[in-house]
Amino acid sequence: GVYSDHAAFNSSYAAVYWPWLQIYDAVNGVKVWCPPSGFMAGVYAYSDNTTEVWFAPAGLTRGHLTQPIKAEYSPSLGERDLLYGNGNAVNPIATFKQDGINVWGQRTLQRLPTALDRINVRRTLLYLEKVLSTAVRGLLFEPNDAATWTRLRRLVTPTLESLKTRRGLQDFKVVCDSTVNTPDVVEQNMVKAYIYVKPMKTVEMIQLNFVITAQGSSFTEAIF
């Protein structure tokens, strides 16, 4: 679609990509320009099929585009930084001489600088909400007591442990006990559980620092 700087976009459930891409229409024998949305659906699907939903659908490994002939415009490094930062949230599609056309960003449209301004984090939470909601359905209409709270913790922990092992989470903690399920909560026929997660961050900058050491000195002395 068309992005307008007058629209107050602010959501972690959406993302914007730019520029448009050109493909060959074999039916009509012409080249046409298309918005990147369709290509991005393919990138997301490829990323999910080859890795996991918490891996960013971007970069040379999962964000490489092979179908487009060319991009409408290839933003420079400075332009990409401007699109991606400084309060903006446009994911650039960049063209590199050796690596072709690649998705070079994974920001959501959330303006508040939290973990949810990244696509991989939002998709991780969507996955957890779906899987864990299904896992605890069997507890509905069970007695609302400590035994049920323990069962809930045991039901959700394996999935969280699995994500931690598979590089989806750095760490987590599940709280479902009398501290959150107070008499008032129980009186409402409700169970509350708080799942604290430390989502996995992605590498978006690489800094290489070169240090020249004097002849005769050891690297141990030079490292600081």
Regions found by a protein language model. Name each.
Residues G1-F224:
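Structured, hydrophobic secondary-structure cores that serve as assembly/anchoring elements
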